[in-house]
Amino acid sequence: EETFREKSDGPTVETREIKNEKNLSKIHFGDVFAVTYTGKLSVYTNGVNYNVPVRETLFDEGMDVVDFFKGLAPVLGDENKTLIVYGKKDFAYAVSDYGVEIKCKTQDVSLIKYLVDYTERKETFDDVIISKGYNPFTPAYDLFLLYDELYSVLVAQDMKSLYEKVELPLSDILYDMERYGFKADVPALKRLSAEYAAEAETLTKKIYELSGEVFNINSPKQLGEVLFGKMAIGKGKKNAGGYSTTAEVLEKYADRHEIIKYILRYRKVQKFKSTYVEGFLAVADKNTGLIHTRFNQTI
């Protein structure tokens, strides 16, 4: 049987269910409130945990996610309130999709946990509350407890300044960078792609000419057999898949045969073209040329 922990220095939390926008609007929010939005919609404030069933169909009781976030808009827009969430940046994405702006102060428990209880693995909020034995039926209250617990450790370890002056502001900066994106010069990238393609073709012909054989240059096995077998440019280093043809190995034989410099250049050109040039072109918005990436602050 699973056991769940309640706050040891306070009463068992009162739990209520919110099934519509009208009831949500009647919540009296204190100066501090916690919100969970992944898995279960839940709000905790003034000693009460409010669970919000998500309406899946027109006939279900509960609220749509959009109505939940819009119902929170007034308190999220109150600069005198403090919001506790697990993942400030992700929460900002979630509410902004519905036109809701966050102006209240925000505490990000995921960042605090990253600083004081780093585990080297990706953990969701649900993972954390289960591992700590919190009650999964009061998620927002659990979040409040987790904040209370970890923030005390943060202060004790003298990392409050790091959290408030570096990590929290950085989260906002990363969010803005992700939303605005990076401008890519698409025409220039396309020209560069064509130039690299032409150079790769020229290098391929030169390599075939010097080796006296047509083969797959991108195949380490075939390349090794040509260089160390047919051409015998050196003894080579064999492994289970054949001869090793890493850059480090090939550079040792650069003075043995001019084919090596062409192979090394061919690899660089292919790497630049496929990984960077084509990679950027694949993710750049076709209309704006902007590249929108995601930054993970807690790894």
Predicted segments with their positions:
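Conserved "right-hand" nucleotidyltransferase catalytic core of DNA-directed polymerases
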Residues: 1-63, 67, 71-77, 81, ...
